[in-house]
Structures are given as C-alpha cells and as structure tokens.
C-alpha cells in the first residue's frame, strides 16, 4: 500500500525467464485514483501491443515449384511449416536506423541435401539473426532452395497481407515482440481515502525484456500526449454568456493513436476539469436565461476523428471542440 502523498511509482514485483524461452515481468503502479487507473489500464496494453516494434520476415517469394500450394518437391516440410519457421526467426539490429525505411530484402540460397538454418540467410547490413541454428527446412534432394524474403518493422498487432498468390509470394505472420499483456486493479484505503494499484503482466520474446518494453511504451505514451501541444488552434470565439469556444485539430496519427488520445483527453478533462469555480456576476446561456453561477471550467467538449489518405496510407486527424 503506497502513501498517496508520495506520488505514483512503478515497482517490478516479479521477473522470470520461462521454459518456453519467453521473458515474464509483473509490475505495480500506485497510488492511483480510479480514473487514472482506468486510463492506464487501457492505454498501456495498447501502447505495448501497437508501439513496440521489431524486425521480422513478413513475406517470402520461393523460387522452387510448389505442388498445390502445399508442398515443395525435395523438401520435407510443408510450405505452411516453412513459412511458420521464417516467422519464428528473431532478427536484431538498431531499430532507430530502420524506422521509416524499408522494406528490406534478404536471400536464402542453398543446395541440398542439407538442413537450411537461419545462419544461411544473407541479410542486409545491420541486421542479424539471434539464433543462427534456428531450423527452416530439410532439403532431402540435391536441389537448390532459393527464397527472397522481405524484412519490415512490425508490432504485435501487425498482420501479414492476405490473398497473395504463388507468383507474388506468400505472407508470413511474424511472432510478435510482445506475446501477451494482462492488467488488473487492486483497491485499498489510505487514511479513509480510496486509491488503486495497477498491476501489469508482460510476456515478451527474446527481442526485448518486459521492463524495457514498459519503459518504451511509457515514453511512447508521453510523446503521444505531447502532440496535443502541437494542435492547430483554428477557431476561437467569446460567447455572449461569458464562455469561450475553441476548435483544435491534430494530425497525422494512426487509428490506435487517435483512440488513445481521445480516451486520455476524455478521462483527463472529466477528472481534472471538474472542480467547481465561482463566476462573478450573473451568468446566462445563449438564450439569455440565467444559469447556476457554480460551474466547471470546461463546460463541454467533443472529440471526433477524420480519416484521410496520403501516399496510399490511411491517417487520422483529431478534431476537438471545447
């Protein structure tokens, strides 16, 4: 139980490496109000699953002839098994060097009979495989096995393309860096006041440790909320009833980023702007009728999303009115 006067702090209460090879971490953040805990319970998992990036194979173009799009002559594994093996390969590199670039191309060019492994892949400069002996395919005949691979930065919510034909290649569903996120809230009283502790359970692959993922997600959220200060203020009016009206626009952002900012602003405005304030003199509404002089600083707000296309990509704009 934390003293609310000390401010909220993170604590790592458990850390482990599981037999499956995954890393596990359990974290606690307290003290929090109910609104704060609710906001972070929604926002942190979204940030972990959408904003933590890693390098992965996302597409494979196989030169060998496929039989009914299921098997390759002279190779023991099915096509589906081979694609899954590519998806399991963990790639490492300095991610900041690859942000906004790519996709990148890698080549697997071997001749059987042999066991093709991750070390056999020719990778672009700056990218390495973590486990060189990771199995790809068993080539049982004296034939070449040639695969052109696409490498991209992906998150835990990234999905391979669908409807790709044999001529164009095959999509790969990559193993995500964040395997799973669970949250829970525990309530407690401190000197008669209710407070809450947020618990966060994170499972990751070997790309990143849970505490590193949490730190990155927290920075992403902070940076995302900082965008609000860059909102364009394109309409302002002082109403006859003494209220002020403003319209703001913020762009570009992804749908996930919009949803989190929308939730954060709604929660923050409802929580932090709800204190009572006395207005000197009579107060009237737009029709001139008298209203209660005790009112909240922010009387009303509305946040909407506008989608638009840019260079084939879909982005969102946030429109807010206060």
Curated annotation (Swiss-Prot):
Gene3D superfamilies: DNA-directed RNA polymerase, insert domain (2.170.120.12), RNA polymerase, RBP11-like subunit (3.30.1360.10). It catalyses: RNA(n) + a ribonucleoside 5'-triphosphate = RNA(n+1) + diphosphate. In plastids the minimal PEP RNA polymerase catalytic core is composed of four subunits: alpha, beta, beta', and beta''. When a (nuclear-encoded) sigma factor is associated with the core the holoenzyme is formed, which can initiate transcription. Keywords: Chloroplast, DNA-directed RNA polymerase, Nucleotidyltransferase, Plastid, Transcription, Transferase. This is Putative DNA-directed RNA polymerase subunit alpha-like 2. The N-terminal domain is essential for RNAP assembly and basal transcription, whereas the C-terminal domain is involved in interaction with transcriptional regulators and with upstream promoter elements. It comes from Pelargonium hortorum (Common geranium). It is an enzyme of class 2 (transferase).
């Amino acid at each position: 139980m934390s003293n609310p006067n000390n401010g909220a702090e993170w604590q790592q209460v458990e850390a482990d490496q599981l037999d499956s090879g995954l890393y596990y971490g359990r974290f606690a953040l307290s003290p929090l109000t109910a609104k704060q805990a609710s906001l972070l319970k929604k926002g942190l998992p979204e940030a972990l699953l959408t904003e933590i990036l890693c390098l992965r194979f996302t597409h494979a173009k196989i030169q060998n002839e496929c039989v009914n799009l299921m098997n390759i002559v002279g190779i023991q594994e099915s096509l589906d098994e081979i694609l899954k093996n590519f998806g399991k390969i963990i790639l490492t590199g300095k991610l900041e060097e690859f942000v906004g670039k790519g996709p990148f191309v890698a080549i697997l060019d071997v001749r059987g009979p042999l066991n093709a492994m991750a070390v056999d892949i020719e990778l672009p400069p700056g990218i390495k495989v973590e486990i060189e002996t990771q199995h790809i395919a068993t080539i049982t005949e004296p034939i070449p096995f040639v695969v052109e691979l696409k490498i991209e930065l992906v998150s835990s919510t990234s999905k391979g393309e669908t409807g790709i034909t044999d001529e164009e290649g095959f999509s790969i569903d990559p193993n995500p860096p964040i395997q799973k996120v669970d949250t829970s809230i525990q309530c407690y009283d401190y000197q008669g006041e209710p407070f809450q502790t947020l618990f966060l359970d994170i499972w990751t692959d070997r790309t990143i440790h849970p505490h590193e993922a949490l730190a990155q997600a927290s920075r992403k959220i902070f940076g995302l909320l900082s965008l609000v200060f860059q909102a364009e203020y394109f309409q302002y009016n002082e109403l006859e009833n003494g209220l002020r009206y403003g319209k703001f626009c913020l762009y570009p952002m992804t749908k996930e980023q919009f949803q989190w900012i929308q939730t954060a602003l709604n929660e923050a405005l409802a929580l932090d702007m709800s204190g009572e304030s006395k207005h000197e003199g009579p107060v009237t509404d737009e029709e001139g009728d008298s209203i209660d002089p005790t009112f909240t600083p922010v009387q009303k707000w509305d946040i909407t999303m506008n989608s638009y296309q840019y260079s084939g990509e879909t982005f969102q704009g946030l429109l807010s009115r206060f």
